[in-house]
Amino acid sequence: MDNTFGKDVKIYKDAFIRASKIKDHAVIGDDCFITDSTIGEYSTIERRGMIFNSTIENYSYTGYNTVVKYASIGKFCSISWNVSIGGANHDVHHLTTHPFPFISKYGFANENTSYESFNDILKIGNDVWIGSNVCILRGVTIGNGAVIGAGAVVTHDVGPYEIWAGVPAKKIGKRFDDKIIEHLFKCSNRGGVVRPAYRIFKRKPVYVQRKCNP
């Protein structure tokens, strides 16, 4: 499969891109490695980012040294540096956690067989903020508007607009009360950010709530 590039895409030195779709106005930093993935409009992959078999939607960005594998990431996500999203699983119920019985290159198996290391779905919603040095395991879903504190290891689903931190990560709060969250969902269901109204996102939630009423 060939690459597809939109208009005004910026690709910096020594970036490697294979079988991927890079949409309009996206930015790919130095020494990035992107394969079998889609990078949305106005999205940025900072230097030394590695994206495998994933979709990153419009207006999202990843910091340097961040790795994303077999994941779906929504719009307007802010992902910091040194983040690991969707690393391979190792089955702790086998006699060994090493994949040598499944992969021929180690000299034991005659042929490669499925290890199912990426089968569990990993999905990150819209407007999610992920701090530096976070690790998000496979099988996790992170809801819209959630915040993950720096250094967290996320092993369970995170609800919309929840704040999680720690090792393992635990819920420590919510960004807004339930009424405001309900209004935010109504806004998003009407089509997301309308460009002429983008300034309301600089305001406090009570202002957003008033603007989003039918």
Regions found by a protein language model. Give the residues of each.
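C-terminal segments of enzyme domains that contribute to small-molecule binding surfaces
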Residues: 93-137, 167-214
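Flexible, glycine/small-residue-enriched loop-and-beta-strand segment within the central core
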Residues: 2, 13-138
